[in-house]
A protein has these predicted regions:
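Active-site-adjacent loop/helix surface patches within enzyme catalytic domains
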Residues: 28, 46-178
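N-terminal pre-domains immediately preceding structured catalytic cores
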Residues: 1-67
Length: 178
């Protein structure tokens, strides 16, 4: 709700140069000449609006809606209306790939992405209604947790690509080039 909280871990917001910005209308990973709203709405069938988020207004009085629209949420009001964390296991491997899929291809958003190295990326202010959990969007904070997904026994190829042993025998993550 417009306030920064120190967490003890690296947090990169949508305002930082290396952040992921769910406020942007353009597709982040499309070639520049194909990333504008005008070209994106033709290229991506799911894209009906330049926004990938909305106003948290369900359960608010008319006066509260005007407060939120005019100056944003105060922390007590946000705490009163938001009571869920929705954790998504994205199977995209990294936060970068997750944002690409959510923002550029599926026209969705999420508040936070937790990357493999522990970095937290915040793509929207918590005052926004991210589009990640359909009917729970208004009352929830959306968090994507980077991982490669679940695989049936015998499907070791993905694990062999992503997890290798270093010189001392310890496992390490190696992001495949694709």
């Amino acid at each position: 709700a417009g306030q920064l909280f120190h967490t003890g871990t690296r947090v990169v917001t949508w305002m930082d140069p290396s952040g992921y910005d769910a406020y942007r209308c353009e597709r982040r990973f499309a070639p520049f000449d194909q990333s504008s709203w005008e070209t994106s709405k033709v290229a991506v069938a799911a894209l009906k609006t330049p926004n990938r988020y909305g106003l948290r207004k369900d359960g608010l009085t008319d006066a509260q809606v005007e407060q939120v629209r005019g100056g944003g949420w105060d922390l007590p009001l946000l705490r009163d209306k938001v009571d869920q964390f929705v954790l998504h296991f994205d199977a995209s491997g990294t936060s970068r790939n997750c944002f690409k899929v959510l923002h550029d291809h599926r026209c969705l958003s999420v508040h936070f992405m937790l990357d493999l190295d522990g970095t937290i990326y915040q793509t929207l202010d918590l005052k926004e209604r991210a589009w990640h959990a359909t009917t729970s969007n208004t009352r929830s904070i959306g968090i994507e947790i980077a991982n490669i997904g679940a695989f049936a026994p015998g499907q070791q190829r993905m694990f062999e690509e992503w997890y290798q042993r270093d010189d001392t025998g310890w496992p390490r993550v190696v992001i495949p080039t694709r």
